[in-house]
């Protein structure tokens, strides 16, 4: 029996354990001090302590995770998302230790992790990129002139950033200079890389991403699109597929562009290519590529009847896959995912750690409702980690039915909860 160590926690760890069980593989959970009795630990076949509650001393400690994998004789490591999922040094260490890395090659993670490099590679693959300037351009004397040519407002972004961190909208050149310095400092602290770049801010925009799976050797397929336009603080909260009110011809072009890009990179495994769609101009632009499983992957799984995590594991272990040809991948119906955060919307979405005293689970016995959750009633939500605790995914024959199913199964117990905010967004 193969043993898979999951280098993560919470709902994504639980989700990966589900695929391990489906494959009849042995799952290993890792945990910090505060996560000793967490759901992912209870759910796994085996578990091992990796350090203190601070992420830097546990879930971000590559050496401790690899040491744990060796101790329990794990065959492979699945990183999930967040933490070390897109850390090329961790991926390389895993490979060098003789353990299988469930993810793309480290050099791919490097090139896609730096948005400046990724933009250059996108251009070489004939993908349109949003008008902007790279990090080197910021040192040139004609910077103000070039910014005016792009046109304000402009988005200042950290080259190594992600999750909405290190992004600021500026409306004039004076504001831009201050923002660049501020973003550089923030990026250095958050990502260890102070490089920033500029991008034209498209006011009437949609955030569309294409789920791909690469097999190396210039081959990849897509699993259609996800619309992730409903966000707060540049972070997604509701995702759906298919994307509404965009011409299918444009979406097909986007998907084919994503496949071409992934193929040109000899990409291996699950990945997501993100685009900005200009509603007024009806044009799309390459944003970035995420070299990991996405939080919102269940949306895609729901409409394509696939298991992307299972595919990741099988591909890494050299097991034959079924969905390797584009004509075998079909979509059916409409799916909506709502992320549930332990936050207080009335206090600018401040995290709300504490004990879960009451948890009412919707009827997930229904085939059109799915709940990916990392907690049970009585569990403690910690302030050490991201406050997202669950995702509820509804599938209907069409968008209206899918949204209505979401509204039915997401109750509104009080006026000040993340659930009430999700209801507001759905309406």
What are these language model-derived features?
Residues 33, 53, 107, 135-138, ...:
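Short, solvent-exposed coil/turn elements at secondary-structure transition points
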Residues 56-57, 109, 166, 297-299:
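A generic structural signal for short coil/turn motifs at secondary-structure boundaries
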Residues 6-22, 27, 47-49, 72, ...:
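ATP-dependent carboxylate activation and anion-phosphoryl transfer catalytic cores
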Residues 1-124, 137-145:
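ATP-binding N-terminal substructure of ATP-dependent carboxylate-amine bond-forming enzymes
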Residues 412-414, 419-427:
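Positively charged, low-complexity/disordered segments
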């Amino acid at each position: 029996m193969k043993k898979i160590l999951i280098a993560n926690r919470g709902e994504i760890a639980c989700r990966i354990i589900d695929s391990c069980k489906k494959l009849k593989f042995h799952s290993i959970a890792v945990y910090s001090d505060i996560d000793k009795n967490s759901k992912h630990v209870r759910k796994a076949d085996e578990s091992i302590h990796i350090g203190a509650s601070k992420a830097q001393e546990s879930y971000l400690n590559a050496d401790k995770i690899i040491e744990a994998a060796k101790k329990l004789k794990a065959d492979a490591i699945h990183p999930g998302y967040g933490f070390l999922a897109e850390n090329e040094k961790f991926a390389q260490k895993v490979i060098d230790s003789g353990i299988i890395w469930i993810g793309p090659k480290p050099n791919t993670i490097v090139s896609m992790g730096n948005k400046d490099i990724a933009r250059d590679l996108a251009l070489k693959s004939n993908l349109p990129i949003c008008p902007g300037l790279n990090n080197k351009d910021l040192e040139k004397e004609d910077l103000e002139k070039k910014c005016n040519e792009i046109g304000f407002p402009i988005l200042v972004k950290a080259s190594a950033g992600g999750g909405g961190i290190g992004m600021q909208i500026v409306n004039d050149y004076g504001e831009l200079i201050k923002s660049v310095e501020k973003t550089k400092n923030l990026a250095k602290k958050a990502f260890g890389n102070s490089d920033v770049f500029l991008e034209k801010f498209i006011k009437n925009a949609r955030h569309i991403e294409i789920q791909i799976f690469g097999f190396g050797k210039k081959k990849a397929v897509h699993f259609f699109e996800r619309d992730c336009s409903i966000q707060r603080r540049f972070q997604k909260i509701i995702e759906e597929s298919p994307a509404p009110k965009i011409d299918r011809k444009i979406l097909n072009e986007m998907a084919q562009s994503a496949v071409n890009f992934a193929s040109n990179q000899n990409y291996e495994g699950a990945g997501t290519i993100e685009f900005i769609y200009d509603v007024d101009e009806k044009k799309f632009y390459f944003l970035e590529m995420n070299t990991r499983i996405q939080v919102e992957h269940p949306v895609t799984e729901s409409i394509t009847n696939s298991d992307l995590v299972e595919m990741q594991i099988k591909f890494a272990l050299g097991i034959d896959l079924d969905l390797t040809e584009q004509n075998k991948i079909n979509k059916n119906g409409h799916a909506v995912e709502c992320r549930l955060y332990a936050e207080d919307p009335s206090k600018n979405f401040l995290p709300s750690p504490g004990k879960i005293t009451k948890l009412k689970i919707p009827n997930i016995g229904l085939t059109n409702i799915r709940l990916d959750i990392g907690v049970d009633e009585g569990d403690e939500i910690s302030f050490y980690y991201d406050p997202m605790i669950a995702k509820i995914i509804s599938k209907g024959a069409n968008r209206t039915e899918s949204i209505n199913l979401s509204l039915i199964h997401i109750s509104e117990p009080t006026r000040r909860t993340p659930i009430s905010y999700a209801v507001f967004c759905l309406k």
